[in-house]
Every structure is written in structure tokens, then in C-alpha cells.
Amino acid sequence: SRACYLAGSIRLTRSAVVQAAEPLTMPAVSDRKRPEGVCFQFPEDLAEIEQAHKHAIRFSDRNLPRRSRRKGREFTGCRPDGEHHTLADVREGRCSVFHLVADMDTENLERLVCGFGKEPSAVPGALGASAAIERYGIPAVQIAGGAQGLRLLRDIPDEETGEIVRRQCATVFPAPAQLACSFDQEVVRAVGRAVGLEMAELGVQLWLGPDTGIMRSPQEARFAEKWSEDPVVCGTMTAALAGGAWPYGTAVLHAQSLPEAVSVSQSALRDVYGLPFEIAADGCRAAKLPDCAISGQRLTENSPLLRAWLLDCGYGGMLWGDETLRSDRIGLEKAAIRILKWMLQAKKL
């Protein structure tokens, strides 16, 4: 007997746009092409097709609105109003975030965007921090890592004597793969809430938690930092963790195990590798872009692939580029707007 069964087929009477896909340089997949133009069938498949129940699938609910398919007006920069502004003015409603960004000079924009996460952290053992720009009232953001909770320095010595003067204790939670084995989003959300409370207590605002990418092999170097080999499980668990931590801190949507350059098909990118990020995009307020090239397009260079992902997922949170390249004034302003909007929403800032 066969080990597989005919699931069904889809016939479209008119076009439907369900994903904002962009053309990519696809690798050749010869085994998926058949000269006869039909898929392989067993002799009894035709009888099963005739007897199968017909079910109509409506794509209208998933069809993207026409306004999202059109390319909007090109961003030409923020227009200043001739006055000096701070982040407190934006928070109190005296000006918009666009006026603040327009008032900032290029040097401070580079400190905020290009130097994000590269400053020494005030929390011992943390990964880093963003620059504190006092002129515009922009505070420093403390960033910590750790797939099983906050990875910080427990014993803090005195700089002169070397003696332990105080301790900061962070809880070590089960590994992401163990939490994912429960298939319980409430459990993962509770873990995120507990980590968020520790973030508020220890002065951390951004947490690079478990890797959102799929677990391709148990022999991976970052096996202990990932959820599962299933993209749906990875996405739902990441969203639950970020949702639990959000009232107190921000869990960053990120993937640290991608190679420097990879070539994948559009279907594999959308349905396997990119699906966890699409699922988790609604629950995450910050995302760290990997400095890698996917089918010749770098995500950190405002590529068509990145713009399509932002449009398809409807993601409007902060984007943090994992690279040191400098950008022009327009690019710096676009990145600074996302960072400042996140700061206005984040707690303890």
C-alpha cells in the first residue's frame, strides 16, 4: 500500500496576492520539473479524485489590500520646524518624532543607529548598550543575551580591591527546546513574564533570547538556543515569550545562526525559514537583522527582500542591523524613527 494519500488541489479562477513576494535568484531544482507537465500519480489516483469531496477555499480573506501592493511615496527625509526638541517633548505631545529626528545632526544619528549595542553596558556582564545622547534626551538602552534567561555577571568585584561587593542573580530557565516540547504557549508566556520582571529589576531593556530560526540539525553549534525544527512551533513560542516579557522589557526577534551567504528558493524561504519570523512579527517590538546575504540580497541594506517581508508581515517595530556600515542621511533617519518609536513605547525608559 502507498504511504501517502492525495490531499487535494487548488484551482484559482482569478489572481490573488497573499504574499508580497519579490523575485529572487533561485537555485535550479530539476527534480521538481517533469516534462509531461503533470505530477506523478498512482493508477488508482484518478478514481480517488472522482470520488473525493470537493471543498472550495476562499483566498479573498488572505488577499492583501491594493494599497499595500502599490509602492508608496518615497521617503525624502524629515522636515525640521526650526526648534530644538528632546525625546521628552515627543512623549508629552509637544512635537512629533519626525521633528526630533530632523533636529538631530548626522553625527548623533550615527551614534544612535550605527552604534546601537556597541557601547559598554552599565549592567555588569551585559552584551552592550546604545549611546546616551543627552542633548536630545535619549537614554542608553541596556542589552543582555541568554537563551535560558538573562546572561549577566553574578559576582561583581570591586575595581580596586577585587573583592566581591555585590551580586546580581538571574534565574536559569529550561532550554528553549525543552519549553517547546510542552507545546504550551501559556508556560512559555509565563517564562517570558518572569524574565521581564528580572529585566525591570536589573535595569535591562532589550533581551536577545532564544534564536527564532529553525533547528536544522542537533549538531548545530547553537542547538541549545533554538526552539524546534518546526517553523510553526518556533514562531508561536517566540511570540508567546515576547508577549510575556513586553510589559516589563522587550525580547528581540533575531536569528544568529544563519550563514554569511545562502541561496534558497522562494517557497523554502517563505514556508520554512521565514515562517517563524512571520508568525512572531505581531508579538515582537524589536528585531535584529542578520548580516547575511539571502539569494544575493542583504537584509541590512534595505533590500527588496526586507521591504517585502515588512509589508507581508505588517511589522512596524524597531529594526536593529547587525553590521557596522554607514548609511546616508535618509537611511539614518528611517532607522532612527523606528528606534525612537520603540523607546516611546518601552517601559523603564
Spell out what each predicted region is.
Residues S1-C4, S9-L349:
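Glycoside hydrolase catalytic-domain context in secreted enzymes
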